[in-house]
Amino acid sequence: MFEKPVVKTFQYGNHTVTLETGVIARQATAAVMVTMDDTAVFVSVVGKKEAVEGQDFFPLTVNYQERTYAAGKIPGGFFKREGRPSEGETLTARLIDRPIRPLFPDAFKNEVQVIATVVSVNPDVQPDIPTMIGTSAALAISGIPFNGPIGAARVGHIDGQLVLNPSNTELEASKLDLVVAGTESAVLMVESEADNLTEEEMLSAVVFGHDQQQAVIKAINEFKAEVATPAWDWVAPAENTALVTKIAELAEAKLVEAYQITEKMARYDRIHEIAGEVNEVLLAEDPEANTKEIHTIFHDLEKTVVRRSIIAGNPRIDGREKDMVRALDVRTGVLPRTHGSSLFTRGETQALVTATLGTQRDAQIIDELTGERKDHFLLHYNFPPYCVGETGFVGSPKRREIGHGKLAKRGIAAVMPSVDEFPYTVRVVSEITESNGSSSMASVCGTSLALMDAGVPIKSSVAGIAMGLVKEGDDFVVLSDILGDEDHLGDMDFKVAGTNTGITALQMDIKIEGITKEIMQIALNQAQGARKHILSVMDEAISGAREDISEFAPRIHTMKISAEKIKDVIGKGGAVIRALTEETGTTIEIEDDGTIKIAATEGAAAKEAIRRIEEITAEVEVGRIYTGKVARLADFGAFVTVLPGKDGLVHISQIAEKRVEKVSDYLTEGQEVQVKVLEIDRQGRVRLSMKEAVEKPAEEANDASEAKGE
């Protein structure tokens, strides 16, 4: 029934990787099962043979899904099945998409869908690298026009050494978590988080990862040759040279002038006018003219005009030189009731950022295939349509918003205090209120400012900068602080975040081959200068965390009790701690080692909660006098509560100096009395006395003094 499967096994660092095709999903255009040391991912590729007529974009979809059965688990929740993609799945899908998208021919508009399903997971091998390898292999054997294959590698930096594909355990000790993907000759994508590494260390890691992944590319090429799928009979549509020439005649000179308008919306209005004029002329000449084709050629002409001007050394679209950063405006404390806030403006890009402090109970619980963990630092990025002067749908975050938020979080993570140093959950929200390039890096700057404004003791300020590149032949120009148009029309988007001493995050997407180590070095060095300039302006506004947190933020007080006393504070069915929180208006968290964290916006409430917990956990001391409350009467005496949850017996003979016939003649339930602790027996029973707690008459005291010779 089955043809013999094609299997390719190769060594990749310390891991054994196997590629297999020919058994599963035979109706897909291509399908590969990739296994890396018990982590297995099944990748399918389906491409449509025909493009939708008139379609002017490439409809590539990448879906990445983790099945809980891969880790031997059953999903939680009511429905007991996987639902919408998690944030982690969305980020991995973007990680796969970014390096493969530039490798399809520009004119290829056929729909392609990649679906990667994690079907087995080794807790020490993250699925993202094998998924990228499997995607590359599936596309390589599909016959679809694809200028791959690509390789992928994770690089760690442990004890000063670069490590290929470190395990999850090793990553905990690593100063770097970097993923690099590329073809045999070029790096295409970098995604990383670092602990203040230098530019040289980061570049070495990128080059190391690219060198090591050549083993993957070689293996996929051999796998492709063995599968021997015929290439699609696809030819790029012939260019309409007559229309290209006509549009250039009509619009080129006008576009050159339009791109000298420095204000974004005014420039867009003028370009829109020019496009309308071109359409009007061409449709008058030929009412059947293809408006989508006209639009595509017009856009290509825009790209040519801008790139040619930059390569020629002319000022950029907004009049800046290549290494200039736009005008900065930095403000903190802009919102009165938030715990921390900032407004960071760089040219026509602006972020309103808030920081909110919560208790550890507010931490996000993340249920991953490799286990459950808590995240005490949350960063959410919102990109509403008004920030670019448009209308649009407002709802749950899109892939781009999730990706940009994660990048900003990576940039800040290295300077965040540990939970032991700062026992709060911190949530940052970046609202992009204006956008013209690099809003994610504006979010990094705004986050650093808002955290300091909130009193979060971050180790240092962090700033981010986006770099761009225009390359024509051997000529190239590296641009600092790119505009949205420069990002769109350029060859590279290179985002760097860091402190004055090093890099904390690096993200790179390259659209062309031929980006050398030297070009990346120039970009990193230029980014360093821009980053330090931004940091100097930020430090003028606020250079360190405020001494105190906001009056509106919960203040966390920490105390320690014996672990044996935890059950007393919690009470039966949680009754005691529930009463404590409700009556004092505090939030109380108890850890297994007896550490108690009390969060309250008012100091008096926290003090009251601490006092009551101390009472609950206090030990009864022999010889000490307590003010207790009569809990219950008995024929032989009375039970008196001396501490919360701790009763003792006052025997009838210990109620008064004279003989007591009936306990109720002297005591009633609820009455407050002074009692002295006489004894605590081996079973923990407390014996009390009222008569011993009563002060002796003055003459007895004097007799006692004389007896001592006073």
UniProtKB/Swiss-Prot annotation:
It is an enzyme of class 2 (transferase). It catalyses: RNA(n+1) + phosphate = RNA(n) + a ribonucleoside 5'-diphosphate. Keywords: Cytoplasm, Magnesium, Metal-binding, Nucleotidyltransferase, RNA-binding, Transferase. GO terms for biological process: mRNA catabolic process; RNA processing. Coiled coil: none annotated. Residues 554-613 form the KH domain. It is found in: Cytoplasm. Residues 623-691 form the S1 motif domain. Residues 691-710 are annotated as: Disordered. Mg(2+) binds at residues 487, 493. Its EC number is 2.7.7.8. It comes from the Bacteria. Pfam families: KH_1, PNPase, RNase_PH, RNase_PH_C, S1. Its cofactor is Mg(2+). Its main location: cytoplasm. Belongs to the polyribonucleotide nucleotidyltransferase family. Involved in mRNA degradation. Catalyzes the phosphorolysis of single-stranded polyribonucleotides processively in the 3'- to 5'-direction. Component of the RNA degradosome, which is a multiprotein complex involved in RNA processing and mRNA degradation. This is Polyribonucleotide nucleotidyltransferase. It comes from Vibrio campbellii (strain ATCC BAA-1116).
